[in-house]
Amino acid sequence: MGEWTWETGMNYNQIDEFERIRDYGLLVVYSNWSFLKNHFKENANYKKRKLGWVAYISGKRESRRLMGDYVLKEDDLRKHVFHEDGTAATTWTIDLHYPDAKNSQNFPGNEFKSIAKHIDIYPYPIPYSCLYSRNVQNLFMAGRNISVTHVALGTTRLMRTTGMMGEVIGMAAK
């Protein structure tokens, strides 16, 4: 039923409106399940099935980011700007998600399906100066909260890359 393209809250503030996003996501899941079981013409496959589990809290692609001594930007990635403090390499395209136009026709402003725009880049070393806070002493970041712009987050937010950032921060904290 669901897949990676199911995401809600693209038009809402990820921090201030989190409960609204969560509630709408649950509404989407249960409404689609009800449709498949009760109204879908070919519902024989769904009629006797049960919904086994639904995550109460969905994964956030983007939320708060802390400010480091450097903010990694799209220009850095596209122009392959050299930083002497380069660390873990990005391993993915710049992957940006937008509401799916077809879904927007039926649910304007409340889309729950997305499309991804991929911008090819070369693997890029994330500057160490993006992995620590510039104004909170001894605070490291290694994940979706690092010091990057929205577009740069599109390549740094992947699990393989965040895991490598964790290794870097673990060594730095020693």
Residue ranges and their predicted role:
Residues 1-174:
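Flavin (FAD/FMN)-binding glycine-rich loop and adjacent Rossmann-like elements that form
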